[in-house]
From Swiss-Prot:
InterPro entries: BAD (IPR018868). Keywords: Acetylation, Apoptosis, Cytoplasm, Membrane, Methylation, Mitochondrion, Mitochondrion outer membrane, Phosphoprotein. The modification N-acetylmethionine is found at M1. The lineage of its organism: Eukaryota, Metazoa, Chordata, Craniata, Vertebrata. One of its GO terms (molecular function) is phospholipid binding. One of its GO terms (cellular component) is mitochondrion. It comes from Homo sapiens. Expressed in a wide variety of tissues. Promotes cell death. Successfully competes for the binding to Bcl-X(L), Bcl-2 and Bcl-W, thereby affecting the level of heterodimerization of these proteins with BAX. Can reverse the death repressor activity of Bcl-X(L), but not that of Bcl-2. Appears to act as a link between growth factor receptor signaling and the apoptotic pathways. The modification Asymmetric dimethylarginine is found at R94, R96. Phosphorylated on one or more of Ser-75, Ser-99, Ser-118 and Ser-134 in response to survival stimuli, which blocks its pro-apoptotic activity. Phosphorylation on Ser-99 or Ser-75 promotes heterodimerization with 14-3-3 proteins. This interaction then facilitates the phosphorylation at Ser-118, a site within the BH3 motif, leading to the release of Bcl-X(L) and the promotion of cell survival. Ser-99 is the major site of AKT/PKB phosphorylation, Ser-118 the major site of protein kinase A (CAPK) phosphorylation. Methylation at Arg-94 and Arg-96 by PRMT1 inhibits Akt-mediated phosphorylation at Ser-99. This is Bcl2-associated agonist of cell death. Belongs to the Bcl-2 family. Forms heterodimers with the anti-apoptotic proteins, Bcl-X(L), Bcl-2 and Bcl-W. Also binds protein S100A10. The Ser-75/Ser-99 phosphorylated form binds 14-3-3 proteins. Interacts with AKT1 and PIM3. Interacts (via BH3 domain) with NOL3 (via CARD domain); preventing the association of BAD with BCL2. Interacts with HIF3A (via C-terminus domain); the interaction reduces the binding between BAD and BAX. Interacts with GIMAP3/IAN4 and GIMAP5/IAN5.
Length: 168
């Protein structure tokens, strides 16, 4: 669950330029508050004065207009950053919006799963397991069809010799 921390006005003014990605605050390094390394969701263009006017926007709108605070480098769905215990260092790059289409999140999960399975497959050969012979099997199947043709042509020739009617 994300909560909106309450800031003191001086802390909020110091961190407003850092939240927008404009570099370090002009006042220098003050006490490390939770607002120094967090920012609003990138899709919401609210400034600090708007937050002061409506500090409890989630209770007025039933949660629909709630401001979500997350770290700058986070591009994962809710809960992954806190669970993994990642550092709270700000990144120079802006994180992906949480309003990205669900297909994107599904594609990323699918891609990670495929990558994991591929890595397991490659690692299995390092453990001494034999390589699969799927390419050889495909070659044998093609050869068996050509052997069938050879056998049929031989059969046709032999039947043609034994019978009075010429073959072909």
């Amino acid at each position: 669950m994300f909560q909106i921390p309450e800031f003191e006005p001086s802390e909020q003014e110091d961190s407003s330029s850092a939240e927008r990605g404009l570099g370090p605050s002009p006042a220098g390094d003050g006490p490390s508050g939770s607002g120094k390394h967090h920012r609003q969701a990138p899709g919401l263009l609210w400034d600090a004065s708007h937050q002061q006017e409506q500090p409890t926007s989630s209770s007025h709108h039933g949660g629909a207009g709630a401001v979500e605070i997350r770290s700058r480098h986070s591009s994962y769905p809710a809960g992954t950053e806190d669970d993994e215990g990642m550092g709270e260092e700000p990144s120079p790059f802006r994180g992906r919006s949480r309003s990205a289409p669900p297909n994107l999140w599904a594609a990323q999960r699918y891609g990670r799963e495929l990558r994991r399975m591929s890595d397991e497959f490659v690692d299995s050969f390092k453990k001494g397991l034999p390589r699969p012979k799927s390419a050889g099997t495909a070659t044998q199947m093609r050869q068996s069809s050509s052997w069938t043709r050879v056998f049929q042509s031989w059969w046709d020739r032999n039947l043609g010799r034994g019978s009075s009617a010429p073959s072909q």
